[in-house]
């Protein structure tokens, strides 16, 4: 029997202490002046020496996002290598929690070893939340609303194959393949007040 598990989590823009919970379980924060995600001194050297993902992989990330955005009146995102470097740095730590605001996470587990990366699994899971979006409360689909958020203009993503026993799993769990998908966005979406910013940024 084939068994796989996908976990998804999103974080609000400018959250003071991000946590690996669904964005809609938390109150949005106020929109403020933001700049692209900073690279801290701890990881600056590592990021400077990190190779960019191959263009074929970048194209997959952008296609998965922009096909969905095109259906909801949002312009196509462009690739942001700074955000991608930061995503790769975080993904490689295999920690199931957020590193910053304006970020979507997904994890895919399989009991079969050496399963290949599949970007559409991560982004596809976020996009699949669309039917859960509540246009009255502007809640229920935090990952999807970040994907289609109109004010967001660029994205940088990374995928990393984590060892068993990471990403919140136990070493005794059956998962032999653990893929971690991380995307960072600028400008971050999911900001408040909801009734002001969601109607102009999320087109169902």
Curated annotation (Swiss-Prot):
UniProt-listed Pfam families: CAP
Localization per Swiss-Prot or TrEMBL: Secreted
Cellular component, GO annotation: extracellular region
Glycosylation sites: 80, 118, 134
CDD domains (alphabetical): CAP_euk (cd05380)
Signal peptide: 1-16
Keywords annotated in UniProt: Fruiting body, Glycoprotein, Secreted, Signal
Domain SCP: 62-185
Family assignment from sequence similarity: Belongs to the CRISP family.
Protein name in UniProt: Fruiting body protein SC7
Organism: Schizophyllum commune (Split gill fungus)
Lineage of the species this protein comes from: Eukaryota, Fungi, Dikarya, Basidiomycota, Agaricomycotina
